[in-house]
A protein has these predicted regions:
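Conserved short loop/turn motifs at secondary-structure junctions
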Residues: 40-43, 72-80, 102-111, 134, ...
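Basic/polar N-terminal segments that are highly enriched at the extreme N-terminus
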Residues: 1-13, 580
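Residue-level signal for inorganic ion chemistry
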Residues: 29, 58, 89, 120, ...
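Active-site cores that bind ATP or allylic diphosphates and position pyrophosphate for catalysis
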Residues: 71, 75-77, 83, 105, ...
């Protein structure tokens, strides 16, 4: 194999299967060699981590092949939609680093879809059905048994046209009539058994108000909207595989049987994102919010993009994660640890290192001059050779972590214990001399002596010492609230666990959720101390509290009351727990 062929082969192997399809379509000249995609969210909730995978695919394909990705809101159900969701969706997409070509709405095409439905009725391809939803469900049959025709299937065209007009005029109550496509009640594909394409909804629409009372169903609106916009590659998840023949049929019909092999959208499916310890159903997330089990859609424990953003995840870390898991044609449960690993990898390269003490005990350097204060130099990020530095004040009295001192330590304890030396990061080597306890035997002060010749940068500072501790000066620090967030669920597969609990106990989704919630998903610490460098920190600043984990200021944080959220611990502790 030549060097060029080897390179081409390597590039070919690196393409995911959707990219291979797109390249094949381009090579064959389909749709005039154009690539156009769309991201079509329904504005009925906040985007979650599962949507991020679809966003990266839709926008990524368009960018890679010089095309455009449009944003189209699938606003065909006014009972659940709101402008609030529209704005949050746009914010999340931009936060991920993408910009859409055009902003569209399915409601932009309501008139075209209506006209198309009228044409289908006139052509004998659609009819108004007056059966109840229960009757229609039974009449559709089963995957192994054909359906039976509706008694209204062959009603006169003029009658269906008249009733369809009444549906939209508000003269028909919700649930009393629907418009169905006339296809094949014996088809092995259940979606071909005269699917409902219009229903009555009297709730005002957030864009069109009371103009429409008859609304198109997703399967009817989606493919046609793709066609009207000029979408070439309609990318969606695997549950839509059975819908594809219907998608193609409706596109054939809207094209009136002309030029069927070109200038049309084609649907391709990839696996959706499934994560351990995560529940992604919008319906269940809404229960969490409404019942107060979390503090809103942007609660840092939520799998929403705004929740991850508030928790301190960077958009780049989510891109890294999506790249790692890739796109396939089969569903799998991905380990949440993979996402956290991507976050750690990204934040390690970008987070500013700072000192924070979460469980403080006072350390007094008995031989350090009283009243003396030194400014120590701390590198913001040692991973960056061009990293700036900041200063941190050092004095006689310091706060250290309570777990960094042990009066009677085991042999391999390398932190602070009487007679043992440790290094205070960016400062001096000190030797512990003892401690002071209260009446209950609790340590309230630790004592040590510093070696003035071991300041960071001095020759003696290179003396071999196994333990290095972080600290902040008692008189030169800021008090802070720290929120230690962890996984919301204590079960690996909350979706399956919830189904099992509900079946076993015949209980509601809410009751099942309460059984699965991790009681340690949020631990709030009030008596924490951070260095003064963080006085001006703001949300979306990426920080590493040295030796503890990655953190970010919360939106609740103020100069008078600093609040920090833990993004992720420095190491994966859940893997150890799950092995026990």
């Amino acid at each position: 194999m030549t060097e060029m062929n080897a390179t081409e082969s390597s590039e070919k192997k690196s393409l995911n299967f959707i990219e291979q399809i797109v390249e094949k379509d381009l090579k064959e000249g389909k749709n005039g060699g154009k690539v156009q995609t769309r991201f079509p969210p329904e504005p009925n909730g906040y985007l979650h981590i599962g949507h991020a995978k679809a966003i990266c695919m839709d926008f990524g394909i368009a960018k890679k092949y010089g095309g455009v990705c449009n944003l189209r809101f699938d606003d065909t159900n006014p009972t659940k939609e709101d402008v609030e969701y529209v704005e949050s969706i746009k914010e999340d997409i931009q936060w991920l680093g993408f910009q859409w070509g055009n902003e569209y709405y399915a409601s932009d095409y309501f008139q075209q879809l209506w006209d198309f439905a009228i044409r289908l009725i006139k052509e004998g391809k659609a009819y108004v059905d007056e059966q109840t939803s229960e009757e229609i469900a039974v009449q559709k049959g089963t995957p192994t048994q054909p359906g039976t025709e509706s008694p209204y299937r062959n009603r006169p065209v003029e009658e269906s046209l008249d009733l369809f007009q009444k549906m939209n005029a508000g003269e028909i109550e919700e649930g009393k009539m629907v418009l169905r496509a006339k296809i094949d009640m014996a088809s092995p594909n259940m979606h071909f058994r005269d699917p409902i394409i219009y229903r009555v909804v009297k709730t005002p629409h957030h864009r069109t108000g009371d103009t429409w009372k008859a609304y198109p169903m997703y399967d009817f609106a989606h493919g046609q909207s793709d066609y009207f916009e000029g979408v070439t590659h309609s990318l969606c998840t695997l549950e839509f595989v059975p819908h594809r023949p219907l998608y193609d049929l409706f596109v054939d019909w809207v094209k009136e049987g002309k030029d069927l092999d070109d200038n049309r959208p084609r649907q391709y499916e990839f696996n959706k994102l499934n994560l351990s310890y995560i529940l992604l159903s919008k319906r269940n997330l809404l229960i969490l919010v409404k019942e107060g089990l979390v503090n809103g859609w942007d609660d840092p424990r939520m799998p929403t993009l705004c929740g991850f953003r508030r928790r301190g995840y960077s958009p780049e870390s989510i891109h890294k994660f999506v790249d790692k898991i890739g796109y396939t044609t089969y569903d799998a449960l991905n380990d949440f640890a993979l996402l956290e690993s991507a976050v750690r990898e990204d934040l390690n390269a970008r987070a500013t290192r700072v000192s924070a003490v979460l469980n403080p005990v006072k350390l007094i350097l008995t031989n350090y001059p009283e009243g003396q204060v030194e400014e120590m130099e701390a590198v913001n990020n040692p991973e960056d050779p061009n990293s700036p530095v900041h200063t941190i004040e050092f004095s006689r009295e310091l706060w250290i972590e309570r777990e960094d001192f042990m009066e009677n330590a085991p042999k391999k304890y390398f932190r602070m214990t009487p007679g043992q030396e440790v290094r205070l990061k960016n400062a001096y080597i000190v030797k512990c001399t003892g401690c002071k306890k209260d009446e209950d035997g609790n340590v309230i002060e630790v004592y040590a002596e510093y070696d003035p010749h071991t300041k960071s940068g001095m020759p003696e500072a290179n003396r071999k010492v196994k333990g290095t501790l972080h600290w902040v000066s008692c008189n030169h620090c800021l008090k802070a609230e720290v929120r230690l967030y962890d996984r919301l669920w204590k079960v690996e597969n909350p979706r399956d666990a919830m189904a099992a609990i509900r079946e076993e106990k015949n209980c509601s989704a809410l009751e099942a959720m309460k059984e699965m919630i991790n009681p340690d998903s949020l631990n709030i610490l009030q008596e924490c101390y951070v260095e003064k460098f963080l006085a001006d920190s703001k949300p979306l600043d990426y920080l590493q509290f040295q030796r503890i984990g990655y953190f970010t200021p919360d939106k609740d944080s103020t100069p008078e009351h600093l609040v920090f959220n833990r993004t992720v611990s420095l190491k994966d502790t859940w893997s150890k727990i799950s092995r026990k």
